[in-house]
């Protein structure tokens, strides 16, 4: 899986990100990309093709990628999140009474930028996407968990990089460049892991589907992707797998939706239009509905 949009219209990877200038620590930039490694290199002038004009400001290069939000089901969803993060004073995804940034030009501190990120993750439109926040810097992690505006919620999935960087060892050019190289390496490892995890899951699912007829664990309907592939007029049934590597659960996607929706109704008293998560009927681990749907779309393409 590369960084292109799949035939089902689902990106293999897409994230929004927060950059911070290494020499000017109070300068930030918010953007989005299907390939954070390539984009970070563009921002730092290592790649001339691809723009990144706004990060060419005098004295701000090189930049480090401080935080990312990934798991978007489409490029459009990522661009909506990016725009809302950039314009917190007017976005419809934050209620007027909840706004931390109330006017254009405000919200420049790291506390405010991360607080806006949390507010966006609270909105139902983004909440059902089960987005993942990844933090690459020790001081960014401290700000996140300090939670100055008291906006933390247990449903926000946060990944803390084990090798997160501390502050640059000095202000000289050599120290700044070394810090930038280490940050780029962290982003490379993160991006590679993300693609590999999805690729390995999809490879295993395709292998199982190539065996032919499979029975839904819920309605017992027979699904045969091999047979459907031979028929130009037949649309493939959307299917669901458990992504626990030791679980062999398989069902129609619609059947699992009914299970997740019913379980969420029991927990909350409300029938969800889109469930956020649910337990695998076979192994009982918590599964992200958005992730299951994303895999299902790739498999049916």
Curated annotation (Swiss-Prot):
Instruction: Respond yes or no to whether keyword Repeat is given for this record.
Output: no
**Which chain segments does UniProt annotate as zinc-finger regions (SLX1-type)?**
216-283
Q: Classify the source by domain of life.
A: Eukaryota
Family matches, as InterPro entries: GIY-YIG_endonuc, GIY-YIG_endonuc_sf, Slx1, SLX1_C, SLX1_endonuclease, Znf_RING/FYVE/PHD
Query: Which top EC class is given?
Result: hydrolase
What CDD domains does the entry give? Answer: GIY-YIG_SLX1 (cd10455)
One GO CC annotation: Slx1-Slx4 complex
Relate the assembly described in the record.
Forms a heterodimer with SLX4.
What protein name applies here?
Structure-specific endonuclease subunit SLX1
Protein's organism: Eremothecium gossypii (strain ATCC 10895 / CBS 109.51 / FGSC 9923 / NRRL Y-1056) (Yeast)
Taxonomy of origin reads: Eukaryota, Fungi, Dikarya, Ascomycota, Saccharomycotina
Q: Which gene encodes it?
A: SLX1
């Amino acid at each position: 899986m590369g960084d292109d949009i799949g035939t089902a219209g689902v990106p293999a990877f897409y994230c929004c990100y927060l950059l911070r200038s290494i020499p000017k620590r109070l300068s930030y930039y918010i953007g989005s990309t299907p390939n954070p490694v390539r984009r970070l290199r563009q921002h730092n002038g290592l790649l001339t093709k691809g723009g990144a004009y706004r990060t060419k400001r005098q004295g701000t290069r090189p930049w480090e990628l401080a935080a990312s939000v990934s798991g978007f089901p489409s490029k459009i969803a990522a661009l909506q999140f990016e725009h809302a993060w950039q314009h917190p004073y007017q976005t419809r995804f934050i209620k007027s009474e909840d706004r931390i940034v109330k006017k254009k030009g405000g919200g420049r501190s790291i506390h405010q930028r991360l607080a806006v990120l949390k507010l966006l993750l609270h909105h139902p439109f983004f909440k059902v996407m089960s987005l993942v926040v990844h933090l690459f810097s020790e001081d960014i992690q401290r700000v996140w968990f300090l939670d100055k505006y008291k906006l933390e919620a247990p449903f926000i999935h946060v990944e803390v990089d084990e090798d997160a960087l501390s502050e640059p060892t000095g202000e000289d050019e050599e120290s700044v460049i070394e810090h930038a190289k280490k940050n780029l390496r962290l982003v490379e490892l993160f991006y590679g892991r993300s693609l590999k995890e999805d690729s390995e899951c999809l490879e295993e699912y395709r292998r199982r589907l190539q065996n032919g007829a499979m029975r839904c664990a819920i309605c017992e309907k027979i699904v045969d992707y091999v047979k459907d592939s031979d028929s130009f007029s037949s649309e493939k049934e959307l299917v669901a797998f458990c992504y626990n590597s030791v679980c062999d659960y398989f069902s129609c996607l619609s059947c699992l939706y009914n299970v997740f929706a019913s379980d969420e109704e029991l927990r909350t008293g409300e029938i969800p239009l889109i469930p956020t998560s649910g337990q695998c009927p076979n192994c009982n681990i918590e599964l992200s509905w958005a992730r299951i749907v994303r895999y299902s779309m790739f498999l049916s393409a």
